[in-house]
C-alpha cells in the first residue's frame, strides 16, 4: 500500500482557521516576531466575509457611534475602501491574501483541513491537516495553537472542554436563559446578492426549489427589492434545530431550496419591485453563526455584556447588540423579526484574555465565534468585527507568551499590562484604558504653530464618550517636539481620523455608520463607493539638522491608512509634522474643502 506525501513544519504559533479572527491572529503574531502557520480549509481567507459566503462585517461600531473596531480590522477595511470602490469580492479576498503573504513569518496552508492532533499530557504537540489541492498531509508542531475554526475542530481532537446549545436560566442567572437547557443553536444562512438593471430580467427557478406562491407564505420576511436594497437575506436561516456541524450538508441543501424559492417569489409571484433586478450570487457554503464554544478560565455572560463590564485582563471589546437568532429561523412565523431575541447595549464591554484560552489544555487559545461565553453573551461577541479584534488580541498574546516562554494563563497573570500596551500601540481600542505615551513626547516638548496639541498625547486615539480626543490643525502648520539635547529618533507613530462612523465617505447613500457598505452590490444607477474625505492624505516629517535647517525625513501624498508607523534613523534636537492635505483635496495642497487635519496621535521614539 502506498502513502500520501507528508510535510513536517515547526513554528511558534499555529492558527487553525482563516476567517477574520484567524487571519488577524496570524498577522498579529507574525508582526510580533513569532513564526506562524495558518491552516485554512478553504481556498480563500475571510470566512463568512469571503467571496464564498459574502456576509458583511458588523461590530460594535454598527450599533454604537465611535466604536468601530480599529487595529488590523480598520487597516483591511480602509485598504478595501481605497482599492475596491465597486466592492468586488475577489478584490476583498486578494486584500486578505496579501496581508498574510506580506508577513514573511507566516506559512499559509490554504485548502488544508485539520484532521488529527497529537498531545502530551495537557499540551498539544502537533496538528495534522490534509491539503486537498496537493494531496499532502501537513503536520505542524507549535508552542501555542489558536483555534479560530469557528466549529472548534480541536475541541474533540484534544479533549478540550466545550459547550453546545442554550443554557438554562439557572446556569448563569441570565434574563434570556431557558427554563431548561437544550442543544439547539443559532442557524446558518446562504446569502443572496442581486443588483438593479435598467431593463426587465426574467428568472426561471429550478424545479427543486421550494415554491412560495403567495405573499402570506412570505409574511413578515423583508423581500421588497427597492425598499430593502441593503439586505443580504440573512434571514434565510436554518439549522439551529439540527447539529450545526455534522448536519451542515443537509442544512445546505434545504437552504438552497429556500433561497431559490425566495428569489422566485420575488420575481414571479406578486409585485415586489423586482422586475429589473438580476441575481448575482446565491452561496453554496452556509455562513454559520454558532456551533461549539470552548470553556476558558472565564465564561462571559449576559450580565457582563449588558453592564459594559471591564476586566483587569481586557484585551478586546464588543458592542453589537444581544442578537440571539432563535433555532427555528426561516421556519418560524411571527411579526417582523420574530425569530430574533434582541437587546441593545448602551456601552462597549470588555473581553478578557481568560475567555480566549482553554481551561484544561495548557497551550490552546481561541478567537472568533468559539470563545468562552454563554449562548446569550455569544450572541453579541460572534459578529466579525468583534471576532477580528479578538483574533488580533489572541495572536499578539500568543507571540508575547512565546517570547517569555510562558502559557497564555501565565501571561495574563504576569504580563497583562505589557500585552494591553502593545495592543493599544497597535491601534486596538480597550475601553477604560489609556495607551502609554513615548517618554520623548511630553507637554514640555510638544508645541504647535496653530491650536492646542495636548490631545495628541492623552493616550486615547478616537472620539469616545463625548470627547473628541483629537487635535484639529490647520494644513501647512507644524506640530513640533523640541528636545533639550540631540536625541535619536527611531520611528514615528501617527493616528489620523479615518471617519470611523463613515459619515464623510462618498458613495454611502444611506450614511451608514457601519461597515455593511463594504459588501453591497452596486446597481446601475449608483456611483461607486468613496473613501473617507476627512483622512489625512499628504504630510511631511522634518527634523532639524546641525545647521539649524529643517530636512525632510519622511513624506507621502498617498496615505490611506488611519495608523502610520514608520522607521526613522535621525539624531536631532527637534522634529515636526506638517499636515499638507486631506482627501477633501484634489491636489497635494489642501486647496478647498477641509482646511484642517484631524489627528489623534503623533509620537516619536
Q: For each predicted feature, which ranges?
A:
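Aromatic, loop-rich ligand-recognition surfaces of beta-strand-rich domains
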Residues: 462-605
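N-terminal Rossmann-fold NAD(P) dinucleotide-binding loop
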Residues: 22
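Predominantly extracellular/luminal regions of secreted and cell-surface proteins
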Residues: 437-460
Amino acid at each position: 500500500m502506498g502513502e500520501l506525501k507528508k510535510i513536517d513544519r515547526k513554528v511558534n504559533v499555529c492558527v487553525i482557521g482563516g476567517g477574520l479572527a484567524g487571519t488577524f491572529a496570524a498577522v498579529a503574531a507574525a508582526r510580533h516576531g513569532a513564526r506562524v502557520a495558518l491552516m485554512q480549509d478553504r481556498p480563500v481567507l475571510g470566512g463568512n466575509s469571503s467571496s464564498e459566503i459574502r456576509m458583511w462585517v458588523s461590530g460594535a461600531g454598527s450599533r454604537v457611534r465611535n466604536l468601530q473596531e480599529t487595529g488590523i480590522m480598520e487597516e483591511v477595511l480602509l485598504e478595501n475602501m481605497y482599492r475596491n470602490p465597486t466592492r468586488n469580492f475577489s478584490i476583498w479576498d486578494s486584500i486578505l491574501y496579501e496581508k498574510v503573504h506580506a508577513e514573511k513569518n507566516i506559512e499559509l496552508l490554504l485548502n488544508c483541513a485539520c484532521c488529527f492532533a497529537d498531545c502530551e499530557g495537557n499540551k498539544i504537540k502537533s496538528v495534522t491537516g490534509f491539503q486537498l489541492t496537493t494531496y499532502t498531509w501537513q503536520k505542524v508542531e507549535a508552542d501555542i495553537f489558536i483555534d479560530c475554526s469557528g466549529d472548534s475542530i480541536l475541541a474533540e481532537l484534544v479533549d478540550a472542554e466545550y459547550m453546545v446549545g442554550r443554557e438554562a436560566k439557572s446556569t448563569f442567572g441570565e434574563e434570556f436563559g431557558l427554563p431548561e437547557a437544550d442543544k439547539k443553536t443559532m442557524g446558518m444562512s446562504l446569502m443572496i446578492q442581486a443588483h438593479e438593471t435598467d431593463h426587465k430580467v426574467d428568472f426561471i427557478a429550478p424545479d427543486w426549489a421550494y415554491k412560495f406562491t403567495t405573499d402570506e407564505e412570505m409574511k413578515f420576511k423583508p423581500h421588497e427589492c427597492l425598499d430593502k436594497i441593503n439586505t443580504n437575506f440573512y434571514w434565510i436561516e436554518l439549522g439551529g434545530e439540527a447539529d450545526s456541524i455534522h448536519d451542515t450538508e443537509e442544512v445546505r441543501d434545504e437552504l438552497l431550496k429556500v433561497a431559490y424559492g425566495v428569489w422566485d417569489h420575488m420575481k414571479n409571484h406578486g409585485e415586489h419591485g423586482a422586475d429589473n433586478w438580476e441575481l448575482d450570487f446565491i452561496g453554496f457554503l452556509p455562513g454559520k453563526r454558532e456551533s461549539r464554544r470552548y470553556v476558558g478560565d472565564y465564561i462571559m455572560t449576559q450580565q457582563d455584556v449588558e453592564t459594559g463590564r471591564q476586566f483587569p485582563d481586557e484585551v478586546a471589546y464588543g458592542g453589537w447588540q444581544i442578537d440571539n437568532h432563535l433555532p427555528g429561523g426561516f421556519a418560524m412565523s411571527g411579526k417582523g423579526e420574530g425569530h430574533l431575541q434582541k437587546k441593545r447595549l448602551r456601552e462597549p464591554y470588555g473581553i478578557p484574555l481568560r475567555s480566549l484560552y482553554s481551561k484544561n489544555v495548557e497551550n490552546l487559545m481561541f478567537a472568533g465565534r468559539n470563545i468562552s461565553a454563554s449562548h446569550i453573551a455569544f450572541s453579541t461577541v460572534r459578529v466579525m468585527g468583534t471576532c477580528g479584534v479578538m483574533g488580533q488580541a489572541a495572536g499578539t498574546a500568543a507571540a508575547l507568551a512565546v517570547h517569555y516562554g510562558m502559557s497564555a494563563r501565565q501571561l495574563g497573570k504576569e504580563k497583562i499590562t505589557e500585552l494591553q500596551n502593545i495592543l493599544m500601540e497597535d491601534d486596538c481600542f480597550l475601553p477604560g484604558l489609556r495607551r502609554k505615551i513615548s517618554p520623548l513626547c511630553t507637554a514640555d516638548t510638544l508645541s504647535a504653530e496653530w491650536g492646542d496639541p495636548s490631545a495628541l498625547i492623552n493616550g486615547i486615539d478616537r472620539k469616545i464618550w463625548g470627547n473628541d480626543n483629537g487635535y484639529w490643525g490647520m494644513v501647512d502648520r507644524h506640530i513640533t517636539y523640541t528636545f533639550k539635547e540631540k536625541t535619536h529618533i527611531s520611528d514615528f507613530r501617527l493616528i489620523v481620523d479615518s471617519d470611523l462612523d463613515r459619515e464623510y465617505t462618498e458613495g454611502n447613500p444611506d450614511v451608514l455608520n457601519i461597515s455593511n457598505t463594504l459588501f453591497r452590490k452596486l446597481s446601475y444607477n449608483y456611483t461607486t463607493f468613496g473613501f473617507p474625505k476627512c483622512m489625512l492624505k499628504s504630510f511631511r516629517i522634518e527634523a532639524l539638522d546641525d545647521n539649524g535647517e529643517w530636512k525632510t525625513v519622511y513624506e507621502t501624498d498617498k496615505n490611506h491608512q488611519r495608523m502610520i508607523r514608520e522607521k526613522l534613523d535621525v539624531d536631532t534636537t527637534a522634529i515636526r509634522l506638517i499636515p499638507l492635505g486631506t482627501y477633501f483635496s484634489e491636489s497635494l495642497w489642501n486647496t478647498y474643502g477641509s482646511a484642517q487635519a484631524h489627528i489623534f496621535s503623533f509620537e516619536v521614539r
